[in-house]
Curated annotation (Swiss-Prot):
This is Large ribosomal subunit protein uL10. Belongs to the universal ribosomal protein uL10 family. The gene is rplJ. Keywords: Ribonucleoprotein, Ribosomal protein, RNA-binding, rRNA-binding. SUPFAM superfamilies: Ribosomal protein L10-like (SSF160369). It comes from Shewanella halifaxensis (strain HAW-EB4).
Length: 165
């Protein structure tokens, strides 16, 4: 189906708006994936706060121009699925990485975070970023372990002092 100029402008504006509000982006090739599986991916994306769109390459190049995701322009070849993380930088990478494990024909091309291009083989860097809650829990565990260690050392010093006296 041919798109009119107004439709193309609307798509570019929509994707550009998503890119401006996104924390990271992932580009993938979805050739060979069934409609049912793509529908499942879209549903999971909505739940994870990820914007997914299959867009023509010329339109997506225009949409990301002037954003942090302009570095992805060289990856826009063949059918392009672009996913923007809106709530957590690693959400789209984690979602598409898990989907690619289940779908052998689904291929992640690259990702971008803070204007830096991340090749597909390094997608784990982005996918393994802890969420805010996970990072906070890790920090609290570190504080808890440090204070417990200090308490144990204080008790040991007190014991040593009493034994010496």
């Amino acid at each position: 189906m041919a798109l009119g100029l107004e439709d193309k402008k609307a798509i570019v504006a929509e994707v550009n708006e998503a890119a401006k509000g996104a924390l990271s982006a992932v580009v993938a090739d979805s050739r060979g994936v069934t409609v049912a599986n793509m529908t499942g991916l879209r549903k999971a994306a909505r739940e994870a706060g990820v914007y997914i769109r299959v867009v023509r390459n010329t339109l997506v190049k225009r949409a990301v121009a002037g954003t942090d995701f302009e570095c992805l322009s060289d990856t826009f070849t063949g059918p392009t699925l672009i996913a923007f993380s809106t709530e957590h930088p690693g959400a789209a990478a984690r979602l598409l990485k898990d989907f690619a494990k289940a779908q052998e024909k689904f291929e992640i091309k690259a990702a971008a975070f803070e204007g830096e291009l991340i090749p597909a083989e390094n997608i784990d860097r982005l996918a393994k970023l802890p969420t805010y809650e996970e990072a906070l829990a890790q920090f609290m565990m570190t504080l808890k372990e440090a204070s417990a260690g200090k308490f144990v050392r204080t008790l040991a010093a007190l014991r040593d002092q009493k034994e010496a006296a």
